[in-house]
Amino acid sequence: ITATRILKRSIDARQRTIFVNLKVRAYIREMPKDDEYEHTIYNKVEGKPQVIVVGAGPGGLFAALRLIELGLRPVVIERGKDVRERKKDLAQISREHTVDPESNYSFGEGGAGAYSDGKLYTRSKKRGNIDKILNVFCQHGASTAILVDAHPHIGTDKLPRVIENMRNTIIECGGEVHFQTRMEALIIENDEVKGIETNTGKTFLGPVILATGHSARDVYRWLAANNVTIEAKGIAVGVR
């Protein structure tokens, strides 16, 4: 054996004796690659067809990065503020008990999870390429420990920097990110979405991805009022 690499790490603390469980890959007469994670290549997309992404939470940010991979130019529209300015508004909630309806725990860059500890859990094994998601986080500044920990955790103190780096990648590749810009309506012609109208008076044209999370009730009310088909997500409820 010439080298080893940890693939998965977990802690079993159910008994008095604590066990650290490791899943390890052994290399025989060869060495592992130097890179601890896989790098995704993001090429320039200036002048490419644009796609409007409404919401700069995890869904919106990852959608924008995926669009760049596919050679499309993302234009991200976020009703709240950037992740650093948003932190000031969260402090106001605690100190002054005042809530900015557009910049709070639900709205703003990073989404509802940006300031809720940064845990990265999923119980499902069928939700796509989870390893790639973790690699993208590492590429933008997260600790490589999340690649092996059974319960990966970025941390609230580190997550804002990771989110900023993801935004910078989008902009450096030729995409756009617009803060304090709220979608007011979809532009629909002949039953086809052509773009969006915003509270700033500016319209953005192109195919639209709604990554609006669970708190943007105004969006869902507009969709329902304009006969756009919407479906409730199914939920599994356990019974004892």
Positions of predicted regions on the chain:
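Residues forming the flavin
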Residues: I1-V20, V24-R240
